[in-house]
Amino acid sequence: MRLLQCSMFMFVALLASAASGLGSEIGARTAYALAQAGKLLIIDVRRPSEWEKTGLPTPSVGISLQNSLRKVRRGFPDDVLDAVDGNKDRPIALICASGGRSAWAVGLLQEIGFSRIHDISEGMFGNGKAPGWLAHNLPVAACESC
């Protein structure tokens, strides 16, 4: 019983630290749990062609970092700001295929004042350290606008 209590305490502490903005990286399972609880907005920064192949994490919002030429879209920061209703302190987590673009986008958004932003660094497919959203069998939804 004591082990169960200790495990629950550690889980709650992990969720609290992830939601409070203390760390910049967050695991896919933790991000999913926080998003399900309404404490975190997940933003998928991959391209629509990628969303079409795998679907988007559920729950999440798709806001592509890049245009079709793989250049950073000028409207990306404004689209993220719209997604959080102008609240740069709202907890958000970014995800891409394997952590590269999401890490870059975290830095970009921090530079313009976002304060509670996390990187789901394992991405959809894994990054060599963790298996990724899909390997965890976390839910995805078809892209309706692709």
Q: Can you annotate each of these PLM segments?
A:
Residues 48:
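Short glycine-rich anion-binding loops that position phosphate/pyrophosphate groups of nucleotides
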Residues 94-96:
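Short, surface-exposed ligand- or partner-binding patches at beta-edge/loop junctions that are enriched
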Residues 41-45:
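Short hydrophobic beta-strand that contains or immediately precedes a catalytic carboxylate
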Residues 17-37, 52-91, 100-146:
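Rhodanese-like catalytic fold shared by cysteine-dependent sulfurtransferases
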Residues 5-17:
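Bacterial N-terminal signal peptides
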